[in-house]
Amino acid sequence: MVNVTGWGALREGGSTSAQLMRVSVPIVSKSECADAYKYMNKITDRMICAGYTSGGKDACQGDSGGPLTADGILYGLVSWGYGCAKPQYPGVYTNVANLRSWIRSHSGV
């Protein structure tokens, strides 16, 4: 399980939250995620997918750029998805580990 935190909308089309929210979601395999989005966007190694196949919990509008963490480790950043918490459509996150050399060369960190 990984954690997503943010002040984004609590439901699709809703208002942003006045307090920081957190949701725990499972990582989704690259093949399962690629299958879900096969008619929309290509899932690359620069992406991590997470969410429940049944939907109900996800990042939403206003959460973009927020952290995807587990045990104090940053694994990803909220990137995109099809709506918010829709069944069969996991959230898509930037894969920080895959972009580590780019981050280092552009930030010095």
Per-segment meaning from a language model:
Residues N3-V109:
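Extracellular trypsin-like serine protease catalytic domains
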